[in-house]
C-alpha cells in the first residue's frame, strides 16, 4: 500500500537526497534494499505497530538516532531481498545506513 506516496518510487543510490525529499514530504518510509535501490513507500501496519511499541518502551528515537533502521523481511517491501525500513533519515544518516548494509554485486 503506497497511499500517500502517490507512486512507488525506485531511486538509485546517486539520487539519495531526492529519496529523502520524496518520502519526507509524503511522510513515507524509505525501503532500503541490499542492492542499494531505495523504495519510498509505507511499511506494513504490523511493522508500524511494533516500532511504536518499541519506541514507547524505550522512550526515545529508534536506536538512538533518526537515521537508524528497523531490519525486517516483508513481502510488502520486496521479494527476495532483505530490506531495511527507515523513517525520515537525513541524507548523511542514509549514507551511513547504506554503508552498513552488505550490497549485492552489480549485475
UniProtKB/Swiss-Prot annotation:
It comes from the Viruses. Residues 51-75, 88-107 are annotated as: Disordered. Residues 63-75 have a biased composition (Polar residues). This is Uncharacterized protein ORF15.
Amino acid at each position: 500500500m503506497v497511499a500517500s506516496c502517490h507512486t512507488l518510487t525506485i531511486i538509485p543510490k546517486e539520487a539519495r537526497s531526492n529519496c529523502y525529499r520524496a518520502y519526507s514530504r509524503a511522510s513515507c518510509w524509505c525501503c532500503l534494499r541490499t542492492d542499494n535501490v531505495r523504495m519510498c513507500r509505507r511499511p506494513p501496519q504490523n511493522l508500524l505497530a511494533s516500532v511504536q511499541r518499541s519506541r514507547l518502551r524505550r522512550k526515545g528515537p529508534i536506536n538512538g538516532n533518526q537515521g537508524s533502521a528497523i531490519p525486517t523481511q516483508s513481502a510488502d517491501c520486496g521479494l527476495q531481498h532483505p530490506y531495511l525500513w527507515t523513517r525520515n533519515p537525513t541524507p548523511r544518516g542514509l549514507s551511513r545506513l547504506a554503508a552498513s548494509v552488505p550490497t549485492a554485486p552489480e549485475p
